Amino acid sequence: MNVAIVTDSNSGIFEEEGKILGVHVIPMPVILEGKTYYEGIDLTHEEFYQCLEEKREVFSSQPSPAEVLDMWDKLLLSEYDELVYIPMSSGLSGSCQTAQVLAQDYEEKVQVVDNHRISVTQRQSVLDALMLKEKGCSAKEIKEALEQTAYESIIYVGVETLEYLKMGGRVTPAGAAMGTLLSIKPLLVIAGERLDAYTKVRGTKSCKKRLLMEMKTIADEFHKNSDEIYVGVAGSFGKKEEHQEWMEMAQEMFPWEDVKYDPLTFSISCHVGPVSYTHLRAHETLRH
């Protein structure tokens, strides 16, 4: 059976890299001042982050059912017998549930994975799916293997301002104003299905240090069950030197890991704003 691996651009994988990896990518749309743009197609990350800094009206969206079905049908009518679709977490978007409903008409030829991943952790799921495909696993077997490790991943997110969380309804206007006055930086966490508040610290440097300390604690826990784990860093920094500095901080904390950096995807950046910084770690059970 020839299995196609499909994901969306929330994984940080875009069309050009997808061709190299052998992955088919559905670009995620974003609504900018009433007009639809597609991540990695007609709107760059630099342009998008600039729009956020200018506080232009931006909303995250999801691919239309027609766009998803068009991709699936083209693959299944060509060289592939079945496919695995790895969208962003169902807890962060309705795109996963939509895909699950659409897949019901394909008699198990389409397997939709819901393992609660986004950004660097979602990328790792795609790479794991490719590895399992090479081992000869079916689409259903790949889906089951990925979902078994759904909760062996965690993401911490630090943000520079509460303004974007206020616009998304995740913090009250009064809370955002007080937080700005006191230079409070929220530390958020994605563990499983939802983006939730974790703690608050004063100042950017303190937030970054606390974030890395929390990740070090998680890393030590993961090491008890696995010798091989994965470190990835993402951010919505507008300047290259800013994301380079953040990656170097993470590399210093985890000198035994080859830390990789990806731009933070549009779907998360819409809610946390520019100059946010994340540290992500996925437990690599599938590597064994």
Describe the function of each predicted region.
Residues L43-F48, S78, Q100-D105:
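A short glycine/small-residue-enriched secondary-structure motif
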Residues Y37, N115-I118:
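A short, ordered amphipathic alpha-helix with a cationic face
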Residues A4, N10-H24, P29, E82, ...:
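Mixed-charge interfacial surface used for oligomerization/domain docking
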Residues S89, H116, L286:
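Short, flexible active-site-adjacent loop segments at beta-strand->alpha-helix junctions, enriched
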Residues K55-S90, G94-T98, K143, A150:
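Glycine-rich phosphate- or other oxyanion-binding loops that anchor nucleotides, phosphorylated ligands
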Residues A282-H288:
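A short, hydrophobic C-terminal helix/tail in secreted or cell-surface proteins
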Residues A4-Q62, E67:
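N-terminal glycine-rich anion-binding loop in soluble enzyme alpha/beta folds
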